[in-house]
Amino acid sequence: MKRRVDKSERKFQAARHQQSSPTPRPKHVRASPQWSWAKIGLISLLILGATIPFLLHVFSDIDDLSRPSDLGLNHTINFYLKTEEGVRVGVWHTVPEHRWKEAQGKNVEWYEKALGDGSPIFIYLHGNTGNRSAPHRIGVANILSALGYHALVMDYRGFGDSTGEPTEPGLTTDAIYLYNWVKKRSGNSLVCVWGHSLGSGVTTNTAVKLLEQGEKFDGIILEGAFLSGRVAANQVFEHPFTWYYWKFPYIQFYLFNPMKNNNLDFPTDKNLEKIRTPIMILHSEDDHLVPMSVAQEIYRIAKKAQNSDERVKLVPFDGKHGYLHNGLYRDPALPNIVREFVQSLTA
């Protein structure tokens, strides 16, 4: 006997069958190959941007600093000075370019004696990252050599192959020691200093200490200078060109943690009030770390302290060239600017 099924039961069974039926899957939408590669490229760039500063910090000392000729510096010798007990600093001495043939194969004693040949001498004090092999530092040494000057580029304690830990008194001690070492061998030659970035703070610290000892540099060049270590970070974070860089996590570690962790102050602003040595300030208008307004303030302080328009000069470089913080050595006008400054020291 057949079971009778009424209409209401048929409707119920149909509804239950519909609920139990699997929902049809939507067709897979495949992303265009162009968009996939664009995403991969963008992610790769972000990773590189975040990690390159960190890698540079970690691997900045892998160069063989004992062989400056392999790094683009001919007629240059590498040597070491013991600035105090337990501290040995590495130094490169590049002689004037016109002596390059004579310098081939010579030892440290020959280079020391060469300091008394009457040519102007520059001590170069670099910034707070890397070592003396950085391209812009080699570039400055080559410019000075081409002008007929001696260039001595030192790695402070804790930098490059120098021993010890970097502290403000320690870096200043290293610079004072190098000055005294050069002065003993320089005869009547001019002895000037070129401080870049953090090196400007070491420069002014050293200049003040030398004044207390009755000594002084014959001329000072400050490039990309900070007013002081204690306000440098704030100045940089407020700079309109730096918004992009601070998106990457290692920038602060790479640039300012060395100053913060080692309590580096370097009161350039206060030091300038005491210095009476001729000063030339070099600054790029597009410096992405130190705004041009800092250079203008340094110029104002130094000019007021020395009460002279002739003994303090500010040389701005057009931002359209893209020199940023480290690239002034590429400007074709720089050698003549430096030459005129040195000539003014003996006028």
Spans of features found by a protein language model:
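Membrane-embedded segments
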Residues: 84-181
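C-terminal catalytic histidine-bearing segment of alpha/beta-hydrolase fold enzymes
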Residues: 292, 296-299, 304-347
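Hydrolase active-site cap/lid region
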Residues: 205-271, 327-330
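Short beta-strand/loop motif that positions the catalytic acidic residue
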Residues: 274-275, 281-283, 287
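Short, low-complexity, Lys/Arg-enriched N-terminal segments of secretory-pathway carbohydrate enzymes
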Residues: 1-32
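Gly/Ala-rich beta-loop-alpha elbow adjacent to hydrolase catalytic centers
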Residues: 195-199, 203
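An N-terminal hydrophobic leader/cap segment in hydrolases
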Residues: 41-82, 87-108
